[in-house]
UniProtKB/Swiss-Prot annotation:
Residues annotated as catalytic: 19, 67
Protein name: Isoprenyl transferase 1
The protein's Enzyme Commission number: 2.5.1.-
Statement: the UniProt record of this protein carries the keyword rRNA processing: no
Species of origin: Bradyrhizobium diazoefficiens (strain JCM 10833 / BCRC 13528 / IAM 13628 / NBRC 14792 / USDA 110)
Keyword field: Magnesium, Metal-binding, Transferase
Taxonomic placement: Bacteria, Pseudomonadati, Pseudomonadota, Alphaproteobacteria, Hyphomicrobiales
Gene3D superfamilies with a match to the protein in the record: Decaprenyl diphosphate synthase-like
Membership in a protein family: Belongs to the UPP synthase family.
Functional description taken from the UniProt entry: Catalyzes the condensation of isopentenyl diphosphate (IPP) with allylic pyrophosphates generating different type of terpenoids.
Length: 246
């Protein structure tokens, strides 16, 4: 049963680990690049569906810091796809009221990618229907470590202030639900601070297969859970012992 602390009327923050592009392609005798291209199509579908399903913030794990270890050709292809997405989706994002933010390091990205990110963020800055956050060259542990280094120079610190140092944004809602596709069951260094009390949903579906129905299924499971945030399970009236029976 859903806790009052997260009602259905609230706009949720959902994070998705988009996993399984390569395996989806390999099983079909296709190149891994074709799998990543299909994954971009899924991003379009989910970005469109998210606001209709009560999501206000959507964080997508696109490229981790550890992904630099992949073959250079695959990394180059992923960067090309990212540049293509940024260049071709901005107009649609603006039209649909989507604000885009890219989180993670930018100093190691090709100049063309970094510039495309800046242009896309500026163009979509006033979107209010959905906040789309794409994690590129991202590591949650690095984000926490960098925040701690900045916090060391402060004389006082609140949890809210530290959260802003970690996320780079004031007032960002903590993550309510993290979804991972492909059947893997781990967080892979994703949203470790802001997802401290996130519910987890793992699906066998590969990312290119994931659709609005799968998203709705994950959200239905989420709304069926009781979020305790460290507290105790709610006790139903019939479970409370009567003094007359004590």
């Amino acid at each position: 049963m859903q806790s009052d602390m997260t009602s259905r009327s609230e706009k949720l923050h959902v994070g998705i680990i988009m996993d399984g592009n390569g395996r989806w392609a390999t099983r079909r005798g296709l190149s891994r690049l074709r799998g990543h291209e299909a994954g971009v199509e899924t991003i379009r579908r989910i970005v469109e569906a998210a606001p209709k399903q009560g999501i206000g913030t959507l964080t997508l794990y696109a490229f981790s810091t550890d992904n630099w270890r992949r073959p250079k050709a695959e990394v180059a292809a992923l960067m090309t796809l990212l540049r293509f997405y940024l260049a071709n989706e901005v107009q649609s994002l603006v039209k649909n009221g989507v604000r885009l933010t890219v989180i993670g390091r930018r100093d190691r990205l090709p100049d063309g990618i970094a510039n495309a990110i800046a242009r896309a963020e500026a163009a979509t800055a006033h979107g209010s229907t959905l906040h789309l956050r794409i994690a590129v060259d991202y590591s949650a542990r690095d984000a926490i470590l960098n925040a701690a280094a900045k916090a060391a120079a402060l004389t006082s610190l609140t949890r809210e202030a530290f959260s802003q140092l970690v996320t780079g944004e004031a007032g960002l809602r903590d993550v309510d639900l993290i979804i991972r596709t492909s059947g893997e069951k781990r967080l892979s260094d994703f949203l470790l601070w802001e997802g401290a009390y996130a519910e987890l949903h793992f699906t066998e579906r590969m990312w290119p297969e994931f659709d609005a129905g799968d998203l709705a299924e994950a959200l239905a499971a989420f709304h069926g859970r009781e979020r305790r945030f460290g507290g105790l399970q709610a006790i139903m009236p019939e479970e409370v012992p009567s003094l007359s029976r004590v």
